[in-house]
From Swiss-Prot:
SUPFAM superfamilies documented for this protein: 2-isopropylmalate synthase LeuA, allosteric (dimerisation) domain, Aldolase
Protein name in UniProt: 2-isopropylmalate synthase
Entry's family note: Belongs to the alpha-IPM synthase/homocitrate synthase family. LeuA type 1 subfamily.
Cellular localization per UniProt: Cytoplasm
Organism name: Chromobacterium violaceum (strain ATCC 12472 / DSM 30191 / JCM 1249 / CCUG 213 / NBRC 12614 / NCIMB 9131 / NCTC 9757 / MK)
EC number in record: 2.3.3.13
Pyruvate carboxyltransferase domain residues: 5-267
GO cellular component annotations of the record: cytosol
Cofactor list: Mn(2+)
Quaternary organization: Homodimer.
Length: 512
């Protein structure tokens, strides 16, 4: 058994900072439960002082999660730290993660504080955090561009104040692996009391090296890695949890560490986060992409058929892909459906959700002869979103399209409990459907992105549509899936409108 590597997931905090990736409290709870099943050690549930909505979500997650540590971020000031402390109070295990910038450019231009003032603020924040919990993490923002002597000083002081985990973020994704490993080795050696705490890496992907730098930090002595599902995060994203976990698992000979993550829950977690945030996973994404275990070359196919390990360093099943791609049919019953969901790592929160998902499955089975695992993931995720959000819900859609004539869309949907009818022409069937919705709603939102992804192969495949809308500075992603791509598009548009409505409700409650 090697050293323990702690996996700190920040999908719900740093990941949510991706444009349009905002989540409701219920969605955050659902993802937190999946992260707990995955076996992550620490779930950073949000930034308690940022908004009442964030505080409520952290508090609810702290009440729900029993096995993982629930953490809140806090700037190094009393208001933030106390908000974090109150938010995590119900947690079986709670952590406060406080931070302040330490690079010369950040201290001078952003904080306008002297190094001594920064040290004092950090020490005070850690001491206040210890009033709430014995588990306190301190981060030196922009650490990889900070003076190492100053870092050793501030880290030494916060250790004396009670910090138990020290995080060294590459905030702007500037680091390179060789220097990262050396930096960690030197910093740990030079920090007074550095052998008494857990050292952590938090790397961003601006130069495409977040995972490589995180692994280099492990070689340099880090025993916690901060990461997100699918590498989600602002700008180019964060270190990808699935890549970090499988790298240390597959190359234990190099890294000599073990995590407690259940790798078979990786794909279910990836699919859930993708659906909730509206961020599709690129097909060639390591571990969780649709092509991650596909072999096109004849030579590769021949080798894999003879012995899988000729071209596969891990099995698809080991990370949660199902070995049996073809699943249920129209004659399958509710128990078979429930059993298959369990095999796929899909857990529904209630009998109501299971019944609704099974009804949707039966509808899909009437349209599609072969139903694959990917269909079930899309169907169940879509149903969970529908149960939660009833402000806008599609009832029916009819589109008439004739060569040389503009398509005409007639739509019926529920708006705030009332059935609405809309009709419009457009430059194409999707445009007509969107305009028919807007004729009724008049949201004033701008369409920023429209993308379509085939969930499985063949002409019967469900199409998964992502729609990104923006309004008054807010950006949201909506998703919809159906065998009819126009219907999927309408679902995605209404899903995005629902997210805008949820954000407005949360803002109104915060202002009240």
């Amino acid at each position: 058994m090697g050293d323990r590597l702690y996996i700190f997931d920040t999908t719900l905090r740093d990941g949510e900072q991706s444009p349009g990736a905002s989540m409701s409290k219920e969605e955050k709870i659902r993802i937190a439960r999946q992260l707990e099943r995955l076996g992550v050690d620490i779930i950073e549930a949000g930034f308690a002082a940022a908004s009442p909505g964030d505080f409520d979500a952290i508090h609810a997650i702290a009440e729900t999660i029993k096995d993982s540590t629930v953490c809140s971020l806090a700037r190094a000031n009393e208001r933030d730290v106390r908000a974090a402390g109150e938010a995590i109070k119900p947690a079986a295990r709670g952590r406060i993660h406080t931070f302040i910038a330490t690079s010369p450019i950040h201290m001078e231009k952003k904080l306008r504080m002297s190094p001594d003032e920064v040290v004092d603020a950090a020490v005070k924040a850690v001491k206040i955090a210890r009033e709430y919990t014995d588990d306190v993490e301190f981060s030196a923002e922009d650490a990889l561009r900070s003076d190492i002597d100053f870092l050793a000083r501030i880290f030494g002081e916060v250790i004396k104040a009670g910090a138990t985990t020290l995080n060294v973020p590459d905030t702007v994704g500037y680091a390179v692996p060789r220097l990262t490993e050396a930096f960690f080795r030197e910093l740990i050696a030079r920090t007074p009391g550095g052998d008494k705490v857990v050292w952590s890496a938090h790397c961003h992907n601006d130069l495409g090296m977040a995972v490589a730098n995180s692994l280099a930090a492990v070689l340099g002595g880090a025993r916690q890695v901060e990461c997100t599902i699918n590498g989600l995060g602002e700008r180019a994203g964060n270190a990808s949890l699935e890549e970090v976990v499988m790298a240390v698992k597959t190359r234990r000979d190099v890294f000599g560490v073990d995590s407690r993550v259940d790798a078979t829950q990786i794909v279910p977690a990836s699919k859930l986060v993708s659906t909730v945030t509206g961020y599709p996973v690129q097909p060639n994404k390591a571990i969780v992409g649709a092509n991650a275990f596909a072999h096109e070359s004849g030579i590769h196919q021949d080798g894999v058929l003879k012995h899988r390990e000729t071209y596969e360093i891990m099995s698809a099943e080991s990370v949660g892909w199902s070995a049996n791609r073809l699943t249920l049919g129209k004659l399958s019953g509710r128990n078979a459906f429930k059993t298959k969901l369990s095999e796929l790592g899909i857990v529904l929160d209630s009998e109501e959700a299971l019944n609704a998902a099974f009804a949707r499955f039966k509808e899909l089975a009437d349209k599609k002869r072969e139903i694959f695992d990917e269909d079930l993931h899309a169907l169940v995720s879509d149903e969970m979103v529908t149960i939660e959000r009833e402000d806008y819900k599609l009832v029916s859609l009819k589109v008439v399209s004739e060569t040389g004539e503009p398509p005409l869309a007639s739509i019926v949907f529920v708006e705030h409990g009332q059935e609405q009818h809309g009709e419009s022409s457009g430059s194409g069937p999707v445009d007509a459907a969107f305009k028919a919705i807007e004729k009724v709603v008049g949201s004033g939102a701008e369409l920023e992105l429209y993308s379509v992804n085939a969930i499985t192969k063949g002409t019967e495949s469900q199409g998964e549509v992502t729609v990104r809308l923006s309004r008054e500075g807010r950006i949201v992603n909506g998703q919809g899936a159906d065998t009819d791509i126009i219907v999927a598009s309408a679902k995605a548009y209404l899903s995005a409108l629902n997210k805008l409505t949820i954000e407005e409700k949360m803002n109104a409650q915060a202002a009240a």
